[in-house]
Amino acid sequence: CDGNVGVTTGAWQKGPANGYFTTVWLRDPKKGKMTWVLDHGDSLATPRAAPDFIESRQAKCGARPAVPIEAGNQGDDMAVGLSPDQTLSWTSTVRPDQSRRVTVRLWDGKDMQTVIDNQVAPPVPAQP
């Protein structure tokens, strides 16, 4: 809720290619500069639908939530992040088959609500 961590997500297009991105940004407490700490995305066969308006959400300030600790399955490469005020969390998981998942949760004053849940299928093996 204090603005020191943010997440952006949206569509990208490059020529005939389409996809999406999700990026987690963290403010340097000394310099004030925002730098990315997680960048994720994938290509899509069809572009995401364009929203009528840009959407914004902000965590509720006040009592801090209890943040559950998650563990990955055996073989998962997992990273977990938490904003300093504990109102925004993110989890990045890469499974042994190279499928990926990024989940972002935001404190609404009562619960940590999932606001982004990106799942990417494993890559298709190249045909010989």
Explain the meaning of each model-derived region.
Residues 18-53, 101, 105-124:
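Short beta-strand edge/turn micro-motifs at domain boundaries
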Residues 41-75:
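Pro/Ala/Gly-rich low-complexity, hydrophilic intrinsically disordered segments
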Residues 1-22, 66-95, 118-128:
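Surface-exposed, charged secondary-structure patches
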